[in-house]
Design a protein with these regions (language model features):
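Active-site-facing alpha/beta catalytic cores
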Residues: 1, 101-111, 116-124
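Glycine-rich tight-turn/loop motif centered on a GG-T
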Residues: 7, 76-81
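Conserved C-terminal portion of the radical SAM core fold
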Residues: 15-74, 83-109
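Radical SAM enzyme core and accessory elements
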Residues: 115-217
Length: 217
């Protein structure tokens, strides 16, 4: 399956290469990119269980395949939908509990697609997979609440504009109301549609300056 997805026969060597790294004291934080009907479900479960047996593998991030609007002459892939996201969350959370926690997590994007509340910050341990989008929302909420409490009440009387991707916009709008009330601000949140990579790309980290300028003018 790995060879099919990556179109590279050398990927068959990956398990042995990882075991060699682990045997030499290298610690690995790994990522599984999941394609519906290709490597989800039982295949995903087997992949996580397999990684759990590899010496040196510390954590696993499970992230949905990302597809831009530029897929000419590429294989047709199925995007993650709400039901698939819910099934994947259930699978991964169950395995994480089985392994004692702090081994495998779904990225925040899964929770957004599933319309499921993201776990609290304590669920993510040391946030080892935050760069893969695991626990970003929980960490942001924790930092926001702490900073807002430290700031105290103010009446700044200013207007500020915030920009983000489509996925995070509802969350940012919710917390911007707290910010406005606490600091005496007028806050407007702008959800930027990603025309550069394609409208299916909704994460904030891939919003481009060009799209921001075009949509805010």
């Amino acid at each position: 399956i790995r060879t099919y997805i990556l179109k590279n026969p050398n990927t068959r060597k990956l398990p042995d290469q990882m075991r060699r790294l682990g045997a030499n004291g290298i610690k690995m934080h790994t990522q599984l990119v999941v394609v519906p009907d290709v490597n989800d479900g039982k295949v995903l479960e087997d992949s996580i269980r397999g990684l759990h047996t590899v010496e040196g593998v510390e954590t696993v991030a499970v992230v949905p395949v990302g597809m831009t609007g530029h897929r000419e002459q590429l294989a047709k892939l199925k995007a993650v939908d709400e039901q698939n996201a819910r099934d994947t969350i259930k699978l991964v959370e169950g395995l994480n509990e089985e392994f004692g926690g702090n081994f495998c997590w779904c990225s925040d994007e899964y929770y957004v697609k599933a319309n499921v509340k993201v776990p609290d910050g304590s669920y993510y341990g040391a946030f080892d997979q935050i760069e893969n989008g695991v626990g970003l929302i929980a960490d942001w909420i924790d930092n926001f609440e702490y900073s807002l409490q430290e700031a105290g009440d103010m009446n700044l009387g200013k207007r500020i504009d915030m920009v983000t991707g489509v996925s995070f916009a509802p969350m940012l709008k919710k917390y911007s109301k707290k910010l406005a009330q606490k600091l005496g601000l007028q806050v407007e949140v702008h959800a930027i549609i990603n025309n550069f990579f394609g409208t299916s790309v909704t994460v904030a980290g891939l919003v481009t300056a060009g799209d921001m300028i075009e949509q805010l003018q």
